[in-house]
Amino acid sequence: LKMKLYRLKILLPFLCLFVLGSASPKMTGEEIGKYIQKKLKRNNHVLRINSKNLGDDGVAYLASSPILKTVKTLILYKGHFGDEGVRALAESENLDQLTTLYLENNNITDLGVEHISRSENLSNLKVLNLYHNQISDKGAGLIAESDTLTELQELNLIYNQIYGPGVIQLTNSTKLKNLKKIELTYNPIKKSAKDA
C-alpha cells in the first residue's frame, strides 16, 4: 500500500500538469497587442498565431487593431474561439487587404461561416481554410451562395460535418467561378454526393 501511495504521489503532479496544462490561459488584450507587434515586425503581410488561447474576446481585440491593415495572410490555428470571434474578423475594416484566411482547429459553426460569407471586408479572399471545425452542409451552402467570396480560389473544409448537399452546392456554384480547389476529405459525405 505504501508503494502504491508513493507512486501516486510521484505521478499526481505530472497528471495535474497534463490535465491542467493542456489549455493555456487566455491571452489578455495587452499580451495579444505585444505579440502581434512582434510578429508583424518580421513580416507585416503575414500574421500566424498558433496554439494561443485567444478566445472570442482575444480575436475581437486582434480584429480591432489597426496594425492589421497590411496583413494579407492571417492564420489562427487552435485559437480556442468560435462564431463571435469570426464575426469580429468579418466586421473588421482592418482586414480588407486579406487574401488568405486560415481558421483551423477552432469551434466555428455555420453561424461563423455566415459571417464570413456575407462580409464585404473579406471580399478579397482567395484562400479560405476552415479545416477541423463544426461546419455542416448549411455552412458549405452559404459559401457556395456567397456574393462576396467571388474571388475564392481554394477552399479547405476537411474534418467538418458535411454529408452531401453542401458538396453539391459547392461544385455547382455559379458564384464561385474562380474556385479551383475544394478539399473535403474526412467529412461523412454520403455516396450520392461523392460523384458531384
What are these regions (language model features)?
Residues 26-29, 33-90, 104:
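LRR N-terminal entry segment and analogous cap-like coil->beta motifs
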Residues 158, 162-196:
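Leucine-rich solenoid repeat scaffolds
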Residues 52, 79, 103-106, 130-133, ...:
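Consensus "Asn ladder" position of solenoid repeat domains
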Residues 1-32:
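Bacterial Sec-dependent N-terminal signal peptides
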Residues 104-105, 109-147:
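Eukaryotic tandem repeat interaction scaffolds
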